[in-house]
Swiss-Prot record:
Protein's UniProt name: NAD-reducing hydrogenase HoxS subunit alpha
Source superkingdom: Bacteria
Binding site for FMN: 332-379
EC top class, as a word: oxidoreductase
Record's subunit section: Tetramer of an alpha and a gamma subunits (flavin-containing dimer), and a delta and a nickel-containing beta subunit (hydrogenase dimer).
Family statement drawn from the similarity comment of this UniProt entry: Belongs to the complex I 51 kDa subunit family.
CC cofactor note: Binds 1 FMN. Binds 1 [4Fe-4S] cluster.
Function: Subunits alpha and gamma of HoxS constitute an NADH--oxidoreductase.
Pfam families: 2Fe-2S_thioredx, Complex1_51K, NADH_4Fe-4S
Reaction catalysed by this enzyme: H2 + NAD(+) = NADH + H(+)
Length: 602
């Protein structure tokens, strides 16, 4: 029996639903998750070692073998690549003496690529375990690696003043918030949280829900479902136990608004959860925080503890006997699919983040099979302000179908990237002027799963649910950028991030990505474009979850808005063989199949 594993199990009371937290602690202790500890973990959690390994293998950040004392994850997002990623990558390989995907012989360094880590406004960026380094350049890499070789820890390098990890100054030492405009809802002024909760507790739960319904607040995670209606459905569901979950798994490339909200206004978010708990009638809440934001965890835990000490969280909130509600932070471990609310719930239960078949919906059967309301970070912050200022105040902003304001995560080819609070209804051109975007050709709205729109064709369109729906990501590309290369990167992202549970997403995106590569290589014909349209429609129609259903959109939206980037690459199709057919490759595959068959039959 390993005493370290015993201690970890005791820390979580051998609760199977805390498996993700347990795996994080195991990896922190050993540097990876060794096979040797799985039987003891399994015995304590009443799981087989295979069950544990199956779950661990699903998540990007869990390692099954020693991968270096310092595990370096360099963001390889599109924005990183247009801001110096390649030079930084080469510097890392040069200074560590290894290639990406390798661990050095001395076991000091491991180099890994990772998708967007929520720092698109300050790329290139990397994680060394749970410590962040931004605005990287080759010279900075040389300095960081030299200090690591001298024995300094990543935290000592990023935080030379030795600031406590619970302090906002610690976070600010590593990451900039870059709040460019402070609108009326999220960052302006200080809310008297005690007075706000006292005001809410004077209302009946149904009146709180009615206020949110009247405000016309819609979910800020992307789907845009009525927040008040979701709460009402959850409240009306028959169950003594219900849950509220804050989705802080901000995995859509180009999005970082939730990171900034959790940094600059975390208590507004948490009090929004308390208000939801009062309205719905539940006692427990969870913040699902993406693994890339581990550096925020201690700071957020301190914010929660301060709320408990102030009587705004925990037992008898606001002095009301019987109103008990508390929040725990559940760390993710690097899985884009966990942005889907049902996959997130699976992860909270200590499982693979596999999307559930719907119905039933989470408000009917969610966490542990109980009614659960899952809302976005921005949604909860908006709730606090609505209950403070009133539904009419919020509804007066925006458009009739899109009330209030929207936080935009602006990045790419502009002079002022960062966070902008704008009213719904602002035009594309107005935002571009605001952020200093010159010579803009395209804007990726809502990340790769959203729309790639043309500035020339769509400049006067409005950001609103009824026109250009936006989950917060606003990524700008100028006329120098190769849009086909961007499409290829986005499709590669979906290939790698598919959970693999359904064939349309798992296999369809591989084929779609291959078609894009053929176009870039000058080996595609019109039939390939026709296939991309029909296959993309099939993936959209038949994928199991919403994330899979949006995965072909990088291709489909650029085919619609920028058909010339495809047409200019096509070759004429003559004869019986498609231009993409490679006889040598085909024969090589046949010969390999014969060899494999011979080995099997020996």
């Amino acid at each position: 029996m390993d005493s370290r594993i015993t201690t970890i199990l005791e820390r979580y009371r051998s609760d199977r639903t805390r498996l993700i937290d347990i795996l994080w602690d195991v990896q922190h202790e050993y540097g990876h998750i060794p096979d040797a500890v799985l039987p003891q973990l399994g015995a304590g959690l009443k799981l087989s070692p295979l069950d544990i390994r199956e779950t661990a293998s699903f998540y990007h950040f869990f390692l099954d073998k020693p991968s270096g004392k310092y595990r370096i994850y360099l963001c390889n997002s599109v924005i990183a690549k247009i801001n110096g990623y390649q030079a930084v990558r080469e510097a890392l390989e040069r200074e560590t003496g290894i290639r990406f995907g390798e661990t050095d012989p001395n076991g000091m360094f491991g180099l890994f690529d990772t998708p967007c880590i929520g720092l698109s406004d300050q790329e290139p960026a990397m994680l060394i375990d749970k410590v962040v380094f931004t605005r990287l350049r080759p010279g900075k890499i040389t300095d960081i690696i030299a200090q690591l070789k001298q024995g300094r820890s990543p935290a000592e390098i990023a935080n030379p003043a030795g600031l406590p990890s619970q302090d906002i100054a610690y976070v600010d030492a590593m990451v900039e918030s870059n709040v460019r405009t402070k609108g009326p809802v999220f960052f302006r002024g200080r809310t008297d949280l005690r007075s706000l909760l006292d005001q809410c507790l004077l209302l009946k739960p149904e009146q709180v829900i009615e206020t949110i319904v009247d405000s016309r607040l819609r979910g800020r995670g992307g789907a845009g479902f009525s927040t008040g209606l979701k709460w009402r459905l959850c409240r009306d569901a028959e169950s003594e136990q219900k849950y509220v979950i804050c989705n802080a798994d901000e995995g859509e490339p180009g999005t970082f608004k939730d990171r900034v909200l959790l940094t600059r206004a975390p208590k507004k978010v948490f009090v929004g959860m308390v208000i939801a708990a009062y309205a719905i009638g539940c006692r427990k809440g969870i913040v699902y925080l993406r693994g890339e934001y581990f550096y925020l965890k201690d700071y957020l835990e301190r914010q929660l503890q301060e709320l408990r000490e102030d009587g705004l969280l925990g037992r008898a909130i606001g002095g009301r006997a019987g109103f008990d509600f508390d929040i725990r932070i559940q760390m993710g471990a690097g899985a884009y699919i966990c942005g889907d609310e049902s996959a997130l719930i699976e992860s909270c239960e200590g499982k693979r983040g596999t999307p559930r078949v719907k119905p039933p919906f989470p408000v009917q059967q969610g966490y542990l099979g109980k009614p659960t309301s899952v809302n976005n970070v921005e949604t909860f912050a908006a709730v606090s302000r609505i209950m403070e200022e009133g539904a009419d105040w919020f509804r007066a902003m925006g458009t009739p179908d899109s009330a209030g304001t929207r936080l935009l995560s602006v990045a790419g080819d502009c002079s002022k990237p960062g966070i902008y609070e704008v009213e719904w209804g602002v035009t594309l051109n107005e935002v571009l002027a605001m952020v200093g975007a010159r010579d803009a050709r395209a804007v990726q709205i809502s990340g790769p799963s959203g729309e790639c729109v043309s500035v020339a064709k769509d400049g006067e369109r409005k950001l609103a649910y009824e026109d250009l729906s936006c989950n917060g990501a606003f990524t700008i590309f100028n006329c120098k950028r190769d849009l086909l290369e961007i499409v290829r990167d986005h499709m590669q992202f979906f290939v790698e991030e598919s959970c693999g549970i359904c064939v349309p997403c798992r296999a369809g995106n591989v084929d779609l990505h291959r078609k894009v590569e053929w176009v870039i290589a000058g080996k595609a014909c019109q039939k390939d474009l026709d296939d991309m349209v029909s296959w993309g429609a099939l993936v959209r129609r038949t994928s199991r979850c919403g994330l899979g259903a949006t995965s072909p959109k990088p291709i489909l939206t650029t085919l619609e808005k920028f058909p010339e980037i495809y047409q200019n690459k096509l070759v004429r199709h003559e004869g019986p063989l498609l231009p993409s057919f490679d006889l040598d490759t085909a024969l090589g595959g046949y010969e390999k199949a014969l060899k494999d068959l011979e080995e099997v039959t020996r």
